[in-house]
Amino acid sequence: FGNKHPRDIDSAGLGDWVVNPKKLPDGIAGLLRDAAKHNIGFGIWIEPEMINTRSELYEKHPDWVMKVPGQDFITARGGTQAVLDLTNPQVRDFIFYTVDTLLARYPEIEYIKWDANMPVLNHGSVHLDKDEQSHLSILYHQGFEDVCRRIRRKYPDVTIQACASGGGRVN
């Protein structure tokens, strides 16, 4: 994934969920075709809650990362990874749109492994009012549940497995 900032290393391209034709000249359709040829169900591993500061998504929406208002934020994994702010409805819509586009375009996808490979290091949101900051964890989780419900409602037969040991998540 990623074209302007290809995901060749873990410090670039996360959040840019577009196929890189240099890596996959036949795109996801080519992978699906090969899987079908060998009678293998196809699954895809994505990390839609995370972003690299070296990504087109961050260049367009730097305000979408979780951070304490008025402060610099902490990055991890290659010095550029951050967590998208699911308290923000625009972020939730983007994540849903990303997954929806993938599944609508490639209905043969049977399985998603949903990674959240980074802990929340920045306990704040530029989207929330001052009096809502203490509810950040609850509101983030409610935002995550909202996205999952929307995906499940539209794609009830797709298996989705959460994977977050790197993020230390237990939800």
Where are these regions (language model features)?
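Short acidic (Asp/Glu) and glycine-rich catalytic loops that position anionic groups and cofactors
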Residues: I74-G79, S125-K130, K154
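Substrate-binding cleft/loops of secretory-pathway carbohydrate-active enzymes
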Residues: N52-H61, Q161-N171
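Active-site beta-loop-alpha junctions enriched in small/polar residues
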Residues: F1-G2, E47-I51, A116-P119, C163-G167
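A structural signal for isolated positions on well-ordered beta-strands in alpha/beta enzyme cores
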Residues: G43, T159-Q161
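Alpha-helix-loop-beta-strand connector modules within alpha/beta enzyme cores
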Residues: D26-A35, L136-Y155
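Aromatic-lined carbohydrate-binding/catalytic grooves of carbohydrate-active enzymes
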Residues: F1-Y97, Y106, E110-Y111
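P-loop NTPase motor core
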Residues: A104-Y106, Y111-D146, V158, S165
